[in-house]
A protein has these predicted regions:
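Beta-propeller domain segments
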Residues: 4-55, 62-66, 70-233, 237, ...
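Blade-level signature of beta-propeller repeat domains, shared across WD40, Kelch, NHL, RCC1
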Residues: 241-268
Length: 268
């Protein structure tokens, strides 16, 4: 975190800014009124009490639906976003259930002052690796003309994996390839039917200089206890947090039974 600055993430209480929300065929509000006090990151002076978003706070970035996975690394703020849901349910003439299972991406963003990441007007598509206009704003699953000014992600992960934490590895215990890269905990999906549910893992994204240097890899897996997993409630464990120990070990927490694992490298 920058000196004397506190960054606060404020998620959006909405799927795609419809009114009423999550209804078949309802267009999105344009402009979306939620962007005034939601769907973004605000910065505050940590030495001043009594601040609000309007008085003392400054909006740092916008266009982020939900972003519990947020961290500061090497002078920049990184976020992994929960993207929108249920494309097929609300727009069945445009998207199939399989479309919804594979899109949109859960994107990793690098935020700077004034960044706009596109929600609710656009989503970053995992199969196409580009922004598309949301159907609530006239999108047909192919067009992204409205999205030209939005900031593209550093990396993208499969649909509905539900990122909940991100930590950049700064230790020396693990092999050199992990240094400076990001570990991301995914809580796992609930709406990928008819495909099996997915996520429920910790991935590693190689990074250097604020950019991805390769594809992500699954670092820790097997939390569900069964495969395929069709019902999220049947998962034995769901990753929910990551921490790095002073000795360079990695701690992974889960939410089903409150377990914590310690991951150490022994050279074997």
């Amino acid at each position: 975190m920058a000196a004397d600055r506190c960054n606060i993430n404020v998620g959006a209480p909405s799927n795609a800014c419809q009114n009423p929300d999550r209804q078949k065929g309802v267009k999105g509000q344009d402009p979306c009124p939620l962007l005034g006090k939601h769907a973004g990151i605000w910065k505050f002076d940590e030495n001043k009490p009594g601040q609000t978003q309007e008085a003392g706070g400054t909006r740092f970035a916008t266009g982020l639906r939900q972003m519990p996975a947020i961290t500061w690394h090497e002078g920049a703020l990184y976020i992994v976003m929960h993207n929108r849901d249920q494309l097929d349910v609300f727009w069945p003439d445009t998207f199939t259930a399989k479309d919804n299972a594979e899109r949109p991406a859960e994107p990793l963003y690098r935020a700077v002052q004034g960044s706009d990441f596109g929600w609710p007007y656009c989503f970053y598509d995992y199969p196409m690796k580009r922004f598309l206009t949301n159907p609530e704003y006239g999108g047909d699953g192919k067009d992204g003309a409205r999205c030209a000014t939005f900031t593209a992600p550093v990396a993208a992960f499969p649909a509905h994996w539900a990122p909940v934490d991100i930590k950049f590895y700064t230790g020396n215990q693990f092999p050199a390839k992990y240094r400076g890269g990001a570990f991301i905990a995914f809580h796992g999906s609930w709406n990928r039917a008819p495909l099996p549910q997915a996520g429920y893992n910790v991935t590693f994204q190689p990074m250097a200089g604020g950019k991805a240097t390769g594809d992500f890899e699954v670092f820790a897996d097997g939390f569900t206890g069964k495969s395929p997993l069709m019902n999220p409630g049947d998962a034995v464990a769901r990753p929910d947090g990551i921490a790095q120990a002073p000795d360079g070990s990695l701690y992974i927490g889960e939410s089903q039974k409150g377990k914590i694992w310690r991951v150490m490298y022994t050279g074997k």
